[in-house]
């Protein structure tokens, strides 16, 4: 199936959308994902600018090429470029998104809009509240609420308008690492998301487990995963990730929230695109 790729700017954020169908009524899922701006590439010949908004496209954020693949339901996902920077070059990062979209769409068996929006400062825009630095002397400023408001009040409504999406299309949010934590947190803050794919989420984040114990998610189902070597780190805070994700699963079980915790082979940097695609597919197929 041929995949159409659109690139545009909204509120000074670059956006890249993959679609496996032009029939809006056949779209069953919308996947929204926040990604580091550099993962969106540097150029694209099929740039689409919303005439009503008159927005200019930041070409440094645009992808290099369109791809042919099958795409799954629309997801929102954020990718931590800081933690994944050793995985690939900038061009490889663009292809990473293409491959991830292809893996999801190949197996989903339904119409999907896979929508990515650019994230500038990872620690600032995806952290739910302020916290001291845990690594590399980079503190967290806690601006996730601003990012969530962009997703719920601007990005998703724009997708619905731009592509004429049906009212019953389910919105899935997900991401890797700190983006996975952001996705979990978002499900506690709003009921717009049908499901969450939290892949290797940063549940070591200071105060997270206390927050999860005192609140209740609004999504129908949650996917959790972690590499079986991720908790083996000398970083005292980040080494809590294993115990905390087990506690997170227990919290969901106690609250009657359908969820799964899947353990993957390897550390935090292994098989990232496969892990993320697998997480999104679980939210669609289970």
PLM segments and residue spans:
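Serine-hydrolase catalytic machinery in alpha/beta-hydrolase-like enzymes
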Residues: 28-51, 60, 64, 72-75, ...
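The conserved beta1-alpha1 loop
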Residues: 32-34, 200, 226
């Amino acid at each position: 199936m041929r995949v159409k790729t659109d690139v545009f700017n909204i509120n000074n954020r670059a956006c890249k959308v993959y679609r496996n169908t032009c029939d809006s009524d056949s779209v069953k899922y919308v996947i929204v994902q926040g990604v580091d701006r550099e993962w969106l590439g540097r150029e694209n010949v099929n740039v689409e600018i919303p005439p009503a908004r008159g927005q200019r496209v930041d070409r440094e954020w645009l992808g290099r090429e369109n791809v042919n693949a099958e795409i799954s339901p629309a997801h929102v996902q954020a990718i931590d470029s800081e933690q994944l920077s050793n995985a690939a070059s900038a061009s490889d990062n663009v292809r990473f998104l293409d491959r991830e979209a292809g893996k999801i769409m190949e197996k989903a068996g339904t119409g999907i809009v896979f929508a990515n929006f650019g994230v500038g400062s990872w620690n600032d825009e995806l952290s739910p509240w302020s916290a001291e630095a845990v690594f590399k002397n980079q503190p967290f400023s806690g601006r996730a609420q601003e990012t969530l408001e962009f997703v719920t009040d601007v990005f998703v409504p724009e997708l619905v308008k731009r592509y004429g999406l049906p009212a019953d299309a389910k919105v899935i949010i997900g991401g890797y690492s700190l983006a996975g934590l952001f996705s979990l947190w978002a499900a506690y803050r709003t009921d717009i998301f049908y499901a969450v794919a939290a892949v290797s989420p940063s549940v070591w984040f200071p105060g997270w487990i206390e927050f999860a114990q005192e609140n209740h998610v609004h999504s129908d189902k949650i996917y959790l995963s972690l590499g079986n070597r991720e908790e083996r780190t000398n970083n005292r805070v980040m080494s809590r990730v294993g115990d905390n994700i087990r506690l997170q699963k227990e919290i969901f079980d106690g609250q009657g929230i359908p969820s799964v915790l899947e353990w993957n082979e390897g550390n935090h940097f292994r098989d990232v695109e496969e892990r993320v695609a697998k997480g999104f597919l679980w939210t669609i197929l289970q």
